[in-house]
């Protein structure tokens, strides 16, 4: 596994489930096309699995 993941919000959270909105916020993403680097661990991978239809993930 990589040390960090680069996450980009590619779809809007308008109309998404409230728990998905909270997950996107917890990942450090706000506006559309915002990007954040997070550590690669099991907790983050679980969060990404929940919102995989809204984000793009790159290993760095």
From Swiss-Prot:
Q: Which CDD domains match?
A: Ribosomal_L30
Transmembrane regions: none
Q: Which GO terms describe its biological process?
A: translation
Q: Does the keyword Ribosomal protein apply?
A: yes
Which Pfam families does the entry link to? Ribosomal_L30
| GO molecular function terms listed in the Swiss-Prot or TrEMBL record | structural constituent of ribosome
Keyword tags: Ribonucleoprotein, Ribosomal protein
How does the record describe its quaternary structure? Part of the 50S ribosomal subunit.
The similarity annotation says: Belongs to the universal ribosomal protein uL30 family.
Write the protein's name: Large ribosomal subunit protein uL30
Q: Which organism is it from?
A: Lachnoclostridium phytofermentans (strain ATCC 700394 / DSM 18823 / ISDg) (Clostridium phytofermentans)
């Amino acid at each position: 596994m990589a040390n960090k993941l680069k996450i980009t919000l590619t779809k809007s959270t308008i109309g998404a489930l409230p728990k998905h909105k909270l997950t996107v916020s917890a990942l450090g993403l706000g506006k559309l096309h915002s990007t954040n680097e997070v550590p690669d661990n099991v907790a983050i991978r679980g969060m990404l699995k929940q919102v995989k239809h809204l984000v793009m993930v790159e290993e760095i």
